């Protein structure tokens, strides 16, 4: 029964391909088998739940219930007394839009289009709605499942089952590459192979591509191709903005697009479809097993599937050439073939595309998977080793606080704010490493002092009072970084007034008094001590000379005390500036 139904479905698909110009808009329209139809329905229901409840998820029971109702409704079979989930009309609309945007048709659409051809109805009347329903629902497995339950599980049967799963996985991956090569709008194919082999394009990259495709109303693959072409071929004026989320996936997307370009190049440059098909499968095989252990079951499965499909392509091409030879025996050699202009010679590789379409149609006509839960929710069924199910891949990462910005963008903004806070507000000179931090004047201390009431040197002296007080002398002193001079408060005021009168408008700069080789440093509030000499005019009176003598004595008496605060290399640097 199952073989009969599968053969009937294959004949229906062949009839559809013969009349594709009257039934669809593009020759490269691909078909959804039973498994792909179920996956598309699952994604449609999850999208509908997200719109109504905010969660992109759906239970297996709801999917199977809606699947049964969908088959009966599309085949115009009675749906009375059948349960249906809420918002079924919305789910059906999302499902139809998904297939339309992906340039795909399901098997029920093919059946309905073929039924619409009144001239060839007798050719496919053998397919009835009930037969197609049994084929899509997998009722032919009912007896087999009951007999399998009585058979105990052995290590050999488990090993064979695992090998079968790996074979199905390898077959699905290679067919996804071929499907994308024929139909660039197939989002399901992109979801399967975007990160196989590992290109660093995980769930986040697929989510960014999906959002960009929805915004531009394009397919996921075309959005990725457009982005990479803009970066590679466009100038600065055409480059994507730095805020584009796809910029973080440039390397992986470029690797993926360049690989598909290599397959397109083989498809367009090799006129022989048999050779072209073999090379395409060989390139895909080498890409998948590159860097893998040759003894790995996945690598063995890839090699076996590629060899089997290569042989199948050659058989398809041989059968097509035989049909063409029989149909053109009564045509004169001088007479051109039908539809040769703008069809057969429009682009090189059309024969290869036809062969690949036949191969994809045969895959769509295969019986559905027995285990629906494994097909829809198994993480390892989709991607080898580090897999993610199709439902999880299409689900966007959860955002906190109902933020519309992606998680990556919010993290970048937070990191930028931290960098701004970490910037130093204190500007130091290139010689700041030679001064001790305890001699630096803090900004808070300056804000607490009335600048209009006291001179600059007096403010510096008062700020350093807690650090530079000499109990033996009994008065406040200024502990400079390299001058080692201690002055009386009243004398400091006189000297600072004289220095201020000499500098004039340069009062905002750093001031320094050079007294007999000893320096007095008056610093700005945010600047480290620097060396600017302010010469004091010589006085002829004896009182001034006595003042200088006292200053020199005080400096010599406190020289040892100040040396204790020197750091390594400071004495040499001080001697250099004295010269």
Swiss-Prot record:
Keywords: Cytoplasm, DNA damage, DNA repair, DNA-binding, Nucleus. The gene is PARPBP. Transmembrane segments: none annotated. Belongs to the PARI family. It is found in: Cytoplasm; Nucleus. SUPFAM superfamilies: P-loop containing nucleoside triphosphate hydrolases. The keyword RNA-binding does not apply. Although it shares some sequence similarity with SRS2 yeast helicase, does not contain a functional ATPase domain suggesting it has no helicase activity. Residues 480-543 are annotated as: Disordered. This is PCNA-interacting partner. It comes from the Eukaryota. Its main location: cytoplasm. InterPro entries: P-loop_NTPase, PARPBP. Required to suppress inappropriate homologous recombination, thereby playing a central role DNA repair and in the maintenance of genomic stability. Antagonizes homologous recombination by interfering with the formation of the RAD51-DNA homologous recombination structure. Binds single-strand DNA and poly(A) homopolymers. Positively regulate the poly(ADP-ribosyl)ation activity of PARP1; however such function may be indirect. It comes from Homo sapiens (Human). One of its GO terms (cellular component) is chromatin. Interacts with RAD51 and PCNA. Interacts with PARP1. Interacts with TASOR. GO terms for molecular function: DNA binding. Restricted to testis. Overexpressed in multiple cancer cells. Coiled coil: none annotated. Residues 486-496 have a biased composition (Basic and acidic residues). GO terms for biological process: DNA repair; negative regulation of double-strand break repair via homologous recombination.
